[in-house]
UniProtKB/Swiss-Prot annotation:
Catalytic site positions: 8, 67, 139
Gene name of this polypeptide: ruvC
The name this protein goes by in its record: Crossover junction endodeoxyribonuclease RuvC
Subunit structure and binding partners: Homodimer which binds Holliday junction (HJ) DNA. The HJ becomes 2-fold symmetrical on binding to RuvC with unstacked arms; it has a different conformation from HJ DNA in complex with RuvA. In the full resolvosome a probable DNA-RuvA(4)-RuvB(12)-RuvC(2) complex forms which resolves the HJ.
Cofactors required: Mg(2+)
Binding site for Mg(2+) 1: 8, 139
Physiological role: The RuvA-RuvB-RuvC complex processes Holliday junction (HJ) DNA during genetic recombination and DNA repair. Endonuclease that resolves HJ intermediates. Cleaves cruciform DNA by making single-stranded nicks across the HJ at symmetrical positions within the homologous arms, yielding a 5'-phosphate and a 3'-hydroxyl group; requires a central core of homology in the junction. The consensus cleavage sequence is 5'-(A/T)TT(C/G)-3'. Cleavage occurs on the 3'-side of the TT dinucleotide at the point of strand exchange.
Keyword hit for Transport: no
GO cellular component, one term: cytoplasm
Entries under Pfam families matching the protein: RuvC
Length: 173
């Protein structure tokens, strides 16, 4: 059994999702958003760090999975996203959680079946896979999808010494 915390980083809204994996069964434990309403970037980063730390303390996850930075059209947006990711990652590392990163396309491919999926498709599939009564809000659904991706890929992956990764089917990664 493992508990996985997924994070969809953002400088204004950071989504989180927590699931438990037992074999192939995934169970929803919680999700939501850390909202930063201040304009001051250092204060936003502090709020993200504190929020992620609180979530880790509450749910005691075994793994931390986060979305990688994508190249935005606006370089300023990409920099802010990178800073938000950094605040969340530092919270995880400070609490000794192993960190895994996944590209948005890889998450969509794993959860929906196509890397070009729309947000509504991700929400629908997360709802279906976790047997939720309603679609989660978009940022929380993305975070849950990241956690689901981690569970799916970790089932097919063996960890070797020196952090080398080899897929169970024999393909080097």
């Amino acid at each position: 059994m493992a508990i996985v915390l997924g994070i969809d980083p953002g400088s204004r809204v950071t989504g989180y999702g927590v699931i438990r994996q037992q074999g192939r069964q995934l169970t929803y434990l919680g999700s939501g958003c850390i909202r930063t309403v201040v304009d001051d970037m250092p204060t936003r980063l502090k709020l993200i760090y504190a929020g992620v730390t609180e979530i880790i303390t509450q749910f005691q996850p075994d793994f931390f999975a986060i979305e990688q930075v994508f190249m935005a059209k606006n370089p300023d947006s990409a920099l802010k996203l990178g800073q938000a990711r950094g605040a969340a990652i530092v919270a995880a590392v400070n609490l000794n959680l192993p960190v895994s990163e996944y590209a948005a396309r890889q998450v969509k491919q794993t959860v929906v079946g196509t890397g070009a999926a729309e947000k509504s498709q991700v929400q629908h599939m997360v709802r279906s896979l976790l047997q939720l009564p309603a679609n989660p809000q978009a940022d929380a659904a993305d975070a849950l999808a990241i956690a689901i991706t981690h569970c799916h890929l970790s089932q097919n992956t063996l960890r070797l010494g020196n952090d080398q990764m080899v897929l169970a089917r024999g393909r080097l990664r």
